Amino acid sequence: MYRTVYHAKIYVDRVGQRSFAGLTDSKRGYGMGRRMVGLHAVFLASALMLGGCGTGNKVVNFEIPNENVTTITFFGNKYEPENVTVIEEILSDFMKENPGIRVSYESLKGNEYYEALGKRFDAGKGDDVFMVNHDVLLEMQSRGQLVDLSGLKTIQDYSDRMLRQMVEHGKIYWVPTTVSGFGLYCNKKLLKEHKQKLPENLQEWRQVCSYFKEQGITPVIANNDISLKTLAIGRSFYSAYQENREDEMFRHLNEGKEQLSFCMTPGFSLVKEFIDNGYVDAGKALETRKTSDDLEEFVKGESPFMLTGAWAAGRVEGMDPDFDFVVAPYPVLEDGGLVVINADTRLSVNRASEHIDEALAFVEFFTRSENIQKFADQQSSFSPLREGIPSSVKEIQPIVSCYQSGRTVIGTDALLEFPIWELTARASERLMKGEELEDTMKWMDQEAAGRRGGW
């Protein structure tokens, strides 16, 4: 299978001023999307050629030799053009302020990224700075592969809720740059054409889904990763968060005093219901990639709902500026909706790095308030900082108000000592393949029991 492979470079002059950003694509049989950003001190001798002058399309770059420059590598899973643009800006500003450090950014998409990250560390070739998620952190912390970041000056800027997630026994091994949200994308035009209201609670959502199913329309577009598991996590854990007993619940789960299925059956029962009723096309969802295939399907305008990350709202708008949609809270409660959130785009530093000081300087720069705000805004996400300003993207304002009112569930709470993100994804997959709920819950309990504390 052939996919487009992207390469991007930023060229920065001696004092760190950004001169040029080039983006090209080529067909390669790699089977993965790849994006690279390298910051180099160069003279850009090809500016006129890019404008149509010179000989052909050949670009000639002359490196400025500088033996005092230290290069650090940054590996991540943010590959989309709009994400890379913001990362380019932050890296360029860092280079300008720190002319003795050069940063090379490389990224892969989705699960391919985490597979590559694991292989690099297994081979002793881990990058200096890299992006992590909850499940990967469990393994890396158990192996002692991460640097304590508690000494960063920017730590004091994080909200109390985020610090509660970040601090473990007085140390911090990762820092979030965004708080992502998951919501119900609603096709306002289609709902209006069918005289259906935007659902605000579970009963209303069931009614609207039943109506569209009777019209021969599959109501909910779901992908094979984040859609159904976040639905299940939100419905299952919401009451614990509202009653401030999540600490006790997660402690019992970690110690094996309580079965994961006991907590998560309410959520996965709803997932099973939507699959069995045909509100979700399970077979199609199994082949649908998150924030990619699902977005393309949604902008066709043929389905009223889509379950995916709110950070894709800008991408949907860009795909069809005239498409009228809104991202609403998950209407999975009898009395309203909720938002599943995650401390996201987490950065960690490799303990085996030969340039730990430079890597720490870079992470500290990246987590300055102005950079966090810029990054979170671009991704239609929330800021993890005390003084963070909510995203101004108009399509996600319904989940902003829900978030601010505290009707939230953390999808990958740091208090959980087993890979909840992976387990719930695999449980969703088993249900989509037709497995009975009881069998899936039994499997999940067995997996959780064998994987507490990591892999």
Language model region names:
Residues Y2-Y6, V12, A21, S46, ...:
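Conserved N-terminal structural module of periplasmic/extracytoplasmic solute-binding proteins
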Residues Y211, L253-A285:
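Glycine-centered hinge/linker elements that transmit conformational signals in sensory
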Residues S92, K96-E97, R102, E193-H194, ...:
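Extracytoplasmic/periplasmic substrate-recognition and gating elements
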Residues L138-Q145, M162-P199, I217, N223-H252, ...:
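Periplasmic solute-binding protein
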Residues I64, D148-Y158, A240-P266, G318-M319, ...:
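Short, solvent-exposed loop/beta-turn-alpha elements that line the ligand-binding surface or hinge
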Residues K109, N133-G183, K197, R206, ...:
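Hinge/lid segment of periplasmic solute-binding proteins
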Residues I90-D93, E97-R161, K189-E200, E296-E297, ...:
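Extracytoplasmic "Venus flytrap"/periplasmic binding protein-like
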